UniProtKB/Swiss-Prot annotation:
PANTHER family: G PROTEIN-COUPLED RECEPTOR 157-RELATED, TRANSMEMBRANE PROTEIN 116. The chain crosses the membrane at residues 29-49, 64-84, 103-123, 147-167, 210-230, 261-281, 295-315. It is a multi-pass membrane protein. The gene is tmem116. One of its GO terms (biological process) is adenylate cyclase-activating G protein-coupled receptor signaling pathway. This is Transmembrane protein 116. InterPro entries: GCR1-cAMP_receptor. It comes from Danio rerio (Zebrafish).
């Protein structure tokens, strides 16, 4: 334990610390500003879905869970910025806050992937309903839809549990005595001293593990999103051509799908690209990010990563015409000349929801 403590105190120190106080101060204000905007963006989706009673709709629930995760993540970013004061000496608090942040952003990765998967399975169900009169393997799809949100929450907890336990056992939070202690993720020193020990320690292993699981979940998410959007595009062409006619409105929807194929992964990469570069360089060649390049990526990361809640609410929520019009699409007997039987309502609602999924993609 003492050996690890001695090595930790020599690692990740800045020189001279006071020269970079302005950099950390800039990052703090960027992080807090973008976190507040993300809170407003994610909160707007949550409030709209709750007040319009849309949370239980199968195409809205994934977006609601993603927005809820984005809201919690933005709150943690905001807390990190508020804790960035010279008088704050709770180093363990900052370390554990970073673990919470890592758990939340990995959960947001999985919820993003789950959202895109739900869009694809909805379109797939519509295709088989058109061919056979009923969706293919509806029971299995329904079970996967229930299991997806649970796994999206549990997997990040399981992946970050070793970081929490080992980090507190070996007191890795002594690294947070430096002025960047509570800011963002991957907050290694801007400059390393010549006395920094390259010796492999428990804390350095934990740091590399954190970066590895971040890179792994990032790649899984962006590759999965690209695959599902590509499959959705080809599936939509099959849905339309099965009717024997491919009109102008179908081409418009197909072009919309193609734009979404680019937009969804691009928005995700925009949020986490700088963090991806920082993590990769810190794993492969840490010397590269010392100095001005590290500062630039660090400031850029504060702008993009903390803006995820704002960007997601625009890309997946308010820019979607179908999402904005869902409040008026509920089944009401009073508005029909031929009232629906109570037993027919679930089937009608399911068909109406599936038929509108192409507008929601």
């Amino acid at each position: 334990m003492d050996i690890f403590g001695e090595n930790k105190t020599q690692m990740n120190t800045t020189t001279p610390t006071e020269n970079w106080t302005s950099v950390y101060s800039i990052v703090r204000w960027i992080q807090m500003t973008m976190a507040v905007l993300s809170i407003l963006g994610a909160g707007s989706i949550i409030l709209y879905a709750a007040f319009q009673r849309l949370v239980k709709k199968p195409e809205v629930l994934p977006l609601f869970l993603l927005s809820l995760t984005d809201l919690l993540l933005a709150l943690s970013w905001l807390c990190g910025g508020l804790l960035f004061t010279q008088s704050c000496n709770s180093y363990a608090t900052c370390y554990n806050l970073h673990i919470v942040e890592q758990t939340l952003y990995m959960a947001s990765f999985f919820y993003t992937l789950h959202y895109v998967w739900v869009l694809y399975t909805g379109l797939n169900g519509k295709y088989h309903r058109r061919l056979n009169g009923f969706p293919a393997e509806a029971a299995r799809t329904r079970n996967c839809r229930c299991l997806g949100p649970v796994l999206s929450c549990l997997l990040p907890l399981l992946l970050t549990a070793p970081v929490f336990v080992a980090g507190n056992v070996f007191q890795c939070y002594t690294n947070f005595t430096q002025p960047y202690r509570c800011l963002l993720m991957h907050t290694g020193a801007v400059y390393l001293t010549s006395s920094a020990s390259p010796e492999l320690t428990a804390c350095s292993i934990i740091q590399e593990y954190c970066m590895a699981i971040f890179l792994g979940t990032f790649l899984i998410t962006i590759v999965g999103m690209s695959i599902f959007m590509g499959k959705a595009r080809s599936l939509y062409k099959r849905v339309v051509t099965s009717q024997g006619f491919f009109g102008g409105s179908h081409w418009t929807t197909l072009r919309l799908l193609e734009r979404r194929m680019v937009l969804y992964p691009s928005a995700f990469f925009f949020c986490w690209g700088p963090a991806l570069l920082l993590a990769t360089m810190m794993l492969v060649k840490p010397d590269v990010i010392e100095g001005k390049m590290g500062v630039a990526l660090y400031i850029l990361q504060a702008f993009t990563s903390a803006s995820q809640g704002l960007l997601n609410c625009l890309v997946y929520g308010w820019t979607q015409k179908h999402f904005r019009s869902l409040s008026s699409s509920t089944v009401r007997d009073a508005n029909t000349q031929t009232p629906l039987l109570r037993s027919q309502k679930p089937n009608y609602a399911a068909l109406h929801s599936a038929a509108s999924l192409t507008n929601f993609v």
